Swiss-Prot record:
Record organism: Gluconobacter oxydans (strain 621H) (Gluconobacter suboxydans)
Keyword annotations: Aminoacyl-tRNA synthetase, ATP-binding, Cytoplasm, Ligase, Nucleotide-binding, Protein biosynthesis
Protein name (Swiss-Prot/TrEMBL): Histidine--tRNA ligase
SUPFAM superfamilies: Class II aaRS ABD-related, Class II aaRS and biotin synthetases
CC terms in the record's Gene Ontology section: cytoplasm
GO biological process: histidyl-tRNA aminoacylation
Coiled-coil zones: none
NCBIfam families to which the protein is assigned, alphabetical: hisS
Gene assigned in the entry: hisS
A molecular function GO annotation: ATP binding
Enzyme Commission number: 6.1.1.21
Pfam families linked: HGTP_anticodon (PF03129), tRNA-synt_His (PF13393)
Amino acid sequence: MSGLQPPRGTHDLIGETMRRHHHVVETARRVLRTYGFEEWSTPIFEDTRVFSRTLGETSDVVSKEMYTFEDRGGESITLRPEGTAAICRALVTNGLTQSLPQKVFYHGSMFRYERPQKGRYRQFHQIGAELIGAESPLRDAETIAMAQDILRELGLGDHVTLELNTLGDLASRQAWREALVAYFRDHADALSEESRVRLEANPLRILDSKSEQDRKLLDAAPAFADYLNDDSRQFWDGLRSSLQAFGVDFVENPRIVRGLDYYSHTAFEFVTSKLGAQGTVLAGGRYEGLVEQMGGPAIPAIGWAGGIERLAMLLDSVPELPAGIALVPMGDEAVLKAASIARVLRSAGLRAEIETRGNMKKRMERVVKSGASHAIVLGDEEIAKNIVQLRDLSSREQQEVPVADLARILSAGRA
């Protein structure tokens, strides 16, 4: 193939791919608004500290995957690798920390330097939601139920499973972390090289390891459930009972963890077996220190993000564009009249195109091939009477219609 190609790990959104993308976003937007969420948009790039502070200097995202550069003013800038940190930054920047709760959703491009594979790109798109100022397990459950409603509206309810875990509070995690570190140190020789590095920097990330030798050790590692204090158990019980009240089914998975201290209590993933190893299509959890890291007060929140590409790949079908209406003018004066009619039809929300190439036969062949529902034919005789010939391309019926009635007739029932 000749010519310039898009960079590795990126792709063009055109045709059906774009329609699928748009359908995911519009479906999610519709559901999110029924829950009272408002759309925000943040810059596609931020001060690098927005992400290095929140994701952790030792995380894979910060150390290996971020697109970071120095701009001409000498500032370190990073293309956003995820959306939550920027939303929390925007909350603080715009003085909204005293106006809680804030129900926010967003969508857009994210960037990570990863190995491209099915459903995973270096420029990818996410849609996410954050309920900032959420203190109860009921709000966590409601936010998860909202995500499930989106998946159901997309027709994916039967293709995904909700996996759920508790991360407890900070005191519970510290007790568990100490037990884990002691266990891993006792078995350090059996850890993979990467996990030995993580043992010193962030031992909880060993739990995310895909290494077979690490997985064997993890099977016998201290169980977090044994280290939950009373407050954490109460929150965990409240979350599960609230999910049941919302009618949300789930499977408990103790291996769902988050490696940063500001995550707490709720962690969840919606997973599918239809995308191979990259089975997570939407994931989230509760966090309690992220706003504080942006210079605001300590505010609890619950949020999630879903990969639009992965969700789009799972769709069985996507709504087609509405059939258009083709105007077929014959003669220079008719072309100008067709332009005027097209403007009126478009103002009424109808899709209208003007066909001017070739003779009448060629024009009608192209109109039929385009999938238009109706053809509007006009020439000098029709202009003189201020009418058009309206042809239904399915039934092949044709009728004379006054120009003034066209938009009403087509809007009411496609004639």
